[in-house]
Amino acid sequence: MATVVRRNERSWAIDLISKINLIAKNNDLVIKKAGGENTISTGRGNTMFPDVVLYGNVEQSVILQGWELKMPDVPIEDETFIKDAQRKAIALNLNSCLIWNFTYAVLYVREEGNSFKKIKQWNATNHIHTREDVETYRSDWEKQLEEIITEVNGYFVSGQFRNAPLGQIISESTITTLIQRNKTIIAESLRANAFRDSVMAAFIDSWWLSVKAEYAQDETDKYKAYAKTIILNWANRILFAHIIKHKQNGAMIVDEIDYDKTPNEANAIFKKITEKCDFYNVFSAVRYNEALPELSWQDFVEFSNFLSSNGIDHLNQETLQNILEGSVATSKRAINGQYTTPTELAKLLVRLTVKNWSDTILDCCCGTGTIPKEAIQIKKTQMTAKEAVETVWACDKNNYPLQVANISMTEPDTINIANRLFQHNALTLSIGEKITITNPETGGNMILALPAFGAVVSNLPFVPFEIIPADDKDEISKMPFVDILDGRSDLYCYIATKIADVIKPEGTLGIIVSNSWLGTNAGIKLMEALKQEYNIKQVHISGQGRWFKNADVVTTILVLEKKKNSNCVDTDFWLWQLSLEQLAENPDAENTLVNSALLSSELDRSVSKLSKYSQSQIESILNLNVCYNALFHDVNWLIDIKDRIIPINKVYNVFRGSRRGWDALFYPQRGEHRIEPQYLKKVLINARNVTKLVATADKDAFCCGVSIEELKKRGHSGALSWIEKFAEQRNGVGKPLPAVLKRTGLEWYELQDKEIAEVFTMMNPDQRLFFAKFETPSFVNQRLIGLTHKAEYPDEELNHALLNSMFTMFYIEASGFGRGLGVLDVNKDNIAKCYMLNPNLVSATDRQNILSAFEKLKARQIMKVSEELKDEIRLDFEHIVLQSFGMEDYFDKIKSSLLSMQETRATARE
């Protein structure tokens, strides 16, 4: 690619740098050296790094300030000139910068919000107006330079200006800057190239299909997503080569990358490095990484020059490791977005899972390598680095995160040891399979047989069943237990079942998965499938906020033991009482949590709470139609009272309110229509404004099953004009409403009102759990669940009272699970299967006592559950109800389980 050399500016900059170095040598200053000789102006018109860099040490690993230089023909107030200097200061994480055009010099300090303030201007050389004057008045500007250096040095001595360690700049700022500057233009280049190359377009489409879930809420444009992959591929290869080149001389040729090289020639350089040093997963090129605009390629060359000319070779091993970890963190944010495994969670997963640290460990969906890195670090406390690395294996179906994983798993003391890292689909792993990696000491191929593993630990991918890739579906169809799993099972369900193939008998599987299995039929079937291969040893959830803070996903940890015989074991359900951040800051608490789980004993309830069940107890509890989510909250008591409760659907018909869509048509606002009264029915649209346990439908619903022709005959112009108002409207994607709303056997504008509710409750409730009764049976819409009593249970008042007991509140919570934002995932099927206290077991005297207490409850407003259970009226009611059923001793247990479930669900918002 073409190089544009700044002749005059460059030569004068070199003179300036030489003069600064002479000043620094002759004086005892904070400023020890100047550099920047390798900066080349590119066709882009702006470079990533300053023309002159002031350093705080001779090794050039502490950067103090960047200067931007121009000749006198560029005014000192030129906006581009000023902004370039300030942009580069931000990129280098500095709080000052200086611009100089030999006529004037101006010093800026960075303030809050990345704004800059001018704090000093030097005017002594304002007689320099032309390029020729720069030579003529050399002695003048050299004298001015000494004054500038002395004054700038004073700002550093006073602490007003801060420095930036090279490691911090590289890991935190530079890679982010590369992404910001180049993502869009590389994406545009990819899009244009793909238009001319259908194979390239097909590749990016296929790649995007396989990784789209990993970019949720981060990138929606496949070309921008792949552009980030290309940027990170170049940046990490360049950085890693510069870091290892002084220990791995084969990597020294990275210094050959310059503006005269093309991307393909640079790829060839990295191929040579791989042949001599291994790290194939780091140095291999992602496909189409050469499809770079010239401006982007110049940025990568400048990045390499910056690393080469600065003091990266003088950094100690700890700093180099921090650079690697920082660049890995930046890359993870760019690649995985919100699904990157937090370091503390990775460490805990490994510690909870591994029984024998001398045995082999595998992460079958390693992503960017957080989990295997933690496994290696723990092993190294009792093993040699070589033994640790060679007993931790990792693979991922996708190649793109393996570069970061290899860097993540590499430390200074393991740089000559080949990571057991390879590309592979977790669904097709088999013991004895041949895996090829390069020996970093000899450069030759190592062919290794995949061993049986003592432990598999992984954060399994969050890929819902709707978007499981076709090749994975093919593998799934061959699985022996596929018929046990639900057809709507997410990808992690299949991986968890299939990975048993490579685990030793009595070996362990520890996985992070979505909490969706806790409250679904698919989850029940997943547990049945897993029990074919494993004992379910531990299940962990957080009672103190989501583990993945940047995602609306709530997760669980499963620890399973591969069966050696058919013996059944107890399952421990652990509810963590401390957040990941609290555990990371408190090693004693972390050890307590891990030791509690390993010993199957609750050592400290302030750290983690244990609910333990035998398999027969779990079966009995699940048969009472609660979901797995309830088992974290000590619900063994439920088995004791099963003869005193009855499913709600034995007492009531349960249905979801009418669901038609397009509320503006079906729920007209008063005063906006002339619809005839016979076509209007009272409806309750939602329960947000319901404040008491007796309610009134407060809106109108348009319920008209009469044809247009019949309406015309009847002269019902109000209904006709209302229908005509919507007949020409379209939905959000441009389809006509009559087509969108058409239903077999119905007019397109027809809303049926066949099911009238006596009692209702909410879909997906939050902090208020209640069943309200209509004064007059009414129509409900899709946001509500309606109930009408069955003839066998005619006592509507008693039924309503028992529905509103604390026990039924418990059941609502126990029948669902918390979504990512803390709302309870409950539908009409959950409610229908909930149990309530059996009305037939209530004596006449007890009935009167219950209804008397319930009248007081109906007279006041509905409260949040936590407030209800502190209220005297509520507590009196609950004690009377439980006494009527001989369950007074269960008050505290029911209350504790209910509040624990609510509190845990609420923390998902945090």
Enumerate the predicted regions with their spans.
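Signature of N6-adenine DNA methyltransferases within the class I
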Residues: 44-47, 78, 92, 104, ...
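Amphipathic alpha-helical coiled-coil/heptad-repeat segments
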Residues: 845-910
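P-loop NTPase catalytic cores that bind/hydrolyze ATP
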Residues: 223-251, 458-459, 554-556, 657, ...
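Polybasic, glycine- and aromatic-enriched phosphate-binding surface used to engage nucleic acids
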Residues: 619, 626-856, 862
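Active-site metal-binding core of divalent-cation-utilizing nuclease and nuclease-like domains
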Residues: 29-60
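Acidic-basic catalytic patches of nuclease active cores, encompassing PD-(D/E)XK
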Residues: 1-41
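Class I S-adenosyl-L-methionine
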Residues: 247, 277-352, 818
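Charged, often flexible domain-edge or linker segments that flank or initiate folded functional domains
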Residues: 50, 55-57, 61-86, 90-291, ...
